[in-house]
Design a protein with these regions (language model features):
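Conserved mid-core segment of classical short-chain dehydrogenase/reductases
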Residues: 82, 93-107, 150
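Active-site helix of classical SDR
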Residues: 121, 157
Length: 255
């Protein structure tokens, strides 16, 4: 009897967008896909598509903001399979209508984009250290390279996501664990569909997922794309701060 353990892959935010596309890419025989998402019906639909590809699938609507729930979810996967890959993909964006709502709005964004990353990644770390193997991917954003006034606090939360992944990469390398920061530009999704401003180099979701999968297979520390957007962000970062500040203040904001 084959005793080869299943390869456990955790993906948050898997009911749509990049998370859903990644789930389909990784689905296959010998894989235990553990998926979370906010929309139960879309999540179950994605789970069935992955099962049709031969994967064993666990799909739950546990919020990434639930510390204990995410800990149980991650450790439960590790009890059923070798924890090979954790992709902290869940994220939210948006805007606020009144300064009276500002505090609640900021905390709502950061609870998902910062606390959600910690609640997904941190329980996996000691498990992977004991295994002496595993890979962690944190989905940040191209917005995580500059402090963008029109994207408060989305930009700063993605700064954290990118920096946390890059710090962990160096710290966990001696433990045999690979870590990558994923920094996409504009990708077709329910989130970007709300944007009312031009989105240069808007990329198809399936193509973005393939770039991410290939970058993770190569153990790239920073998976940033598309390259024209990477070049633009790099050039902006070289500007004197007063000029950069002037330009970023005129960038469109999120609604």
């Amino acid at each position: 009897m084959d005793q080869t353990p299943l390869s456990g892959i955790v993906i948050t935010g898997a009911s749509s967008g990049i998370g859903a596309a990644l789930a389909e890419l990784y689905a296959g025989p010998g894989v235990l896909l553990a998926l979370t998402g906010r929309d139960a019906s879309r999540l179950e639909e994605m789970a069935e598509r992955c099962r049709a590809r031969g994967a064993t699938v666990i799909a739950e609507t546990v919020p990434v903001t639930d510390v204990d729930g995410m800990h149980r979810f991650i450790t439960g996967v590790a009890a059923a399979a070798r924890l090979d890959l954790v992709i902290a993909n869940a994220g939210v964006s948006g805007g606020f209508k009144s300064w009276d709502d500002f505090d609640a709005y900021v905390r709502g964004i950061t609870s998902v984009n910062i606390d959600g990353v910690l609640n997904t990644v941190n329980p996996a770390v000691p498990i992977m250290v004991r295994q002496r193997s595993g890979q962690i991917a944190v989905v940040a954003s191209m917005a995580g390279f500059l402090a963008m006034p029109g994207a408060v606090p989305y930009s700063s939360s993605k700064h954290f996501a990118r920096a946390y992944a890059e710090e962990l990469r160096g710290r966990l390398a001696p433990e045999g664990i690979r870590v990558s920061a994923i920094c996409p530009g504009f990708v077709v999704s329910r989130m970007t569909a709300r944007n009312k401003f031009p989105m240069p180099f808007l990329m198809d979701t399936a193509k973005a997922a393939r770039i991410i999968r290939d970058g993770l297979a190569r153990n790239r520390g920073r998976i940033a794309f598309p390259w024209p957007m990477v070049a633009i962000m790099g050039a902006l970062g070289l500007l004197p701060y007063p000029l950069l500040d002037w330009l970023l203040r005129r960038a469109p904001g999120k609604d």
